[in-house]
Amino acid sequence: MTDKLTSLRQITTVVADTGDIAAMKLYQPQDATTNPSIILNAAQIPEYRKLIDEAITWAREQSSDHAQQIVDATDKLAVNIGLEILKLIPGRISTEVDARLSYDTVASVAKAKRLIKLYNEAGISNDRILIKLASTWQGIRAAEQLEKEGINCNLTLLFSFAQARACAEAGVFLISPFVGRILDWYKANGDQKEFAPSEDPGVVSVTEIYQYYKKHGYKTVVMGASFRNLGEIIELAGCDRLTIAPSLLKELAESEGPVERKLAYTGEIQAKPAPLTEAEFYWQHNQDPMAVDKLADGIRKFAIDQGKLEKMISDLL
């Protein structure tokens, strides 16, 4: 009998949410996603020590200023880890822009181009890279500009329908709505502690976004992310892509039985609405207390891990 991971691959592109080379070799995903937390964890893996040393040596050659060396080495390390992962996957690597730039469009564009330049100098073309940006209004505007310049983006930390709609209207390549973190919020802030997979608030959110995109003919890829259990993944089978942590990839691979398509749109394509204005975006996003909390929390957490990574680099310089 076929295992659930093999079955899922027939209807959804499976992406690995990790920087672990061993997991890449084992589960052979199409694409891979990283973020500051994943890079920080990957930096502890012994096989990656040479990538850290190489990034530090390179940074010393770029500048004599210690603060600039930290920035350069951190960027280079993220790209070095991405390069190692690209050797193991046929598709794309997602590399994230510093979360502390989430409300600065100009700085986000500059950082994205810096990361792309480092990949290009290593012989990697733009069609194998996705630049990850937080789904703030400023991040979405940065992505809109980058897409026009041939740099595809992955808009992350997406929790509200307003964020999803603004991303589609900006023509971004891909969004990563966070299923599990939505569930976390409802469990922590409501009376209900258990949800059937089909009623899981994160699953409901991604389903709504998927149906809206397909109904209006938006090309933006929907990639569900941040899963807490197998039920969420099975309930979103048919989503364009799903990025899954190694522990859940393992669980899927060890579970037998078919996975049935749950997401599909069979209706007619309807006209797109007028794009959200900045004021409309903020008003609609702020009507969702979960999304407001989780976006801010996600940015803070990624910024903390970015700081830890820089501290580790600083101590080695």
Curated annotation (Swiss-Prot):
GO terms for cellular component: cytosol. Homodimer. It is found in: Cytoplasm. This is Transaldolase. It comes from Yersinia pseudotuberculosis serotype O:3 (strain YPIII). Transaldolase is important for the balance of metabolites in the pentose-phosphate pathway. GO terms for biological process: carbohydrate metabolic process; pentose-phosphate shunt. Keywords: Cytoplasm, Pentose shunt, Schiff base, Transferase. The lineage of its organism: Bacteria, Pseudomonadati, Pseudomonadota, Gammaproteobacteria, Enterobacterales. Pathway: Carbohydrate degradation; pentose phosphate pathway; D-glyceraldehyde 3-phosphate and beta-D-fructose 6-phosphate from D-ribose 5-phosphate and D-xylulose 5-phosphate (non-oxidative stage): step 2/3. The active site is at 132 (schiff-base intermediate with substrate). InterPro entries: Aldolase_TIM, TAL/FSA, Transaldolase_1, Transaldolase_AS. Its EC number is 2.2.1.2. GO terms for molecular function: transaldolase activity. Its main location: cytoplasm. It comes from the Bacteria. It holds the Pfam family TAL_FSA. It catalyses: D-sedoheptulose 7-phosphate + D-glyceraldehyde 3-phosphate = D-erythrose 4-phosphate + beta-D-fructose 6-phosphate.
